[in-house]
Amino acid sequence: MQTVLLSHSLDHGVLVITVHQDPGIGGRATLLMRISDLVRAYRPEPVVVLLDEPAARGAVVSVVLRVHRLCSRLGTLLSVATHSAPVRRALEANADTAGTRLVVHARADTAVAAAFAAAA
């Protein structure tokens, strides 16, 4: 049985990408490619990455930080929502400060609403 790694939807003009599973170290490149392709396809829409509990791990944090750098280069707003306080702290501490700020939320609804408001 194949596990769904991620899904996406458009919510009020915000691209919402939900990462359901941790791909592990070996799956990082695939996850990065899939998210990057979505970001480029929906550009200039703001992006919210939601990390389901099983996905809130080191490999996914690394991917999100790389996606943040891509979004900064593209001028696209990126927000992340995760219930995991350690993951939120890791994202905030390691985010690239040279480009667009990475916005990290504890709740998905808050992240989408804030991204929608910022893009309006």
Per-region residue spans from a language model:
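STAS-like cytosolic regulatory interaction modules
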Residues: 1-47, 51-54, 71-120
